[in-house]
Regions:
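Conserved core of the sugar-phosphate nucleotidyltransferase
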Residues: 140-223
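Active-site mouth loops of central-metabolism enzymes
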Residues: 37-43
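Terminal amphipathic alpha-helical/low-complexity segments used for targeting or macromolecular assembly
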Residues: 1, 11, 54, 210-232
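Aromatic- and Gly/Pro-rich amphipathic surface segment
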Residues: 29-37
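Residues that scaffold the ATP/ADP-binding catalytic core of kinase and kinase-like folds
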Residues: 14, 79, 189, 224-225
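Conserved beta-strand segments of alpha/beta enzyme cores
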Residues: 38, 93-95, 185
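Conserved N-terminal catalytic core of the sugar/cofactor nucleotidyltransferase
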Residues: 1-6, 12-30, 43-128
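Conserved beta-loop-beta/alpha segment of the NTase-like Rossmann-fold superfamily
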Residues: 92-177
Length: 232
């Protein structure tokens, strides 16, 4: 199935706290304070980031989008309704999955819980493979299309050359780095790496690979791990 699950359920609290340190104009800052970060307008067109992402996904060959949001998601529906051209050919659909807080909690849990709730609400995700990504990263058509190609492995992800992202050292240092073996199979993901770990995981070309949370999973193999994921 050409399915893409997009995670857009967070409160964007860290981003909103840092808005005053950005070079965004006053209008964009005001919008960013009101909406999820995936709905912030970008570029000359001022289309929301999510719309750019959906356009790239459609161009890459995806047909079914599962957008994970908080239950109060009317803003997402309002924004997407302003772009009917996305849905004009009838082969591109957006389904909404809601991430509910667990009983006794005011806030939802993390990524594993979000994906598990989406799979529970849409059982077809358990029966098929799907791509998973963040709603606040703008992935290229090329990267999204790569994960639709046939693979021998049941799961896969896109690794990015750290130096090619052109982010500040402070920002890039927060990215998880990927340990890959000689055949490019993932052996470990290192969150918040130290400078020593960065040096340790450089390859023979002095490259360090990082994750931008762009994955391909086989649903039936993934679900048991989501169900057993510890809370931390």
């Amino acid at each position: 199935m050409n399915s893409l699950v997009i995670m857009a359920g967070g409160a964007s609290s860290r981003m909103k706290k840092s808005l005053e340190q950005t070079s965004l104009d006053a209008t964009t800052k005001a919008i960013a304070q009101r909406v999820h970060k995936s709905l912030i307008p970008l570029g000359v067109s001022q289309k929301p980031l999510l719309v750019h992402l959906l356009e790239n996904a459609q161009a890459a060959g995806y047909e079914k989008i599962y957008l994970i949001t908080a239950p109060e998601n009317s803003t997402f529906k309002t924004v997407l309704s302003a772009y009917p051209s996305l849905f004009s050919n009838g082969n591109f659909q957006v389904h909404y999955a809601f991430q509910y807080p667990p009983t006794g909690h005011s806030k939802p849990l993390g990524t594993a819980d979000a994906v598990l709730q989406a799979m529970t609400q849409y059982p077809e995700l358990e029966k098929n493979a799907f791509t998973l990504c963040n709603g606040d990263n703008l992935y290229s058509k090329k990267s999204l299309a790569l994960l639709l190609k046939p693979h021998n492995a049941p799961h896969s992800l896109i690794s990015y050359d750290r130096s090619g992202l052109h982010f500040s050292e402070e920002r890039i240092a927060r990215f998880a780095i990927l340990a890959l073996d000689s055949e490019s199979y993932l052996t470990e993901i290192i969150e918040k790496p130290t400078s020593e770990q960065l040096a340790q995981f450089r390859d023979e070309k002095e490259k360090v690979y990082v994750s931008m949370n762009l994955f391909r999973f086989t649903g039936k193999l993934l679900k048991p791990y989501l169900e057993k994921c510890p809370i931390h």
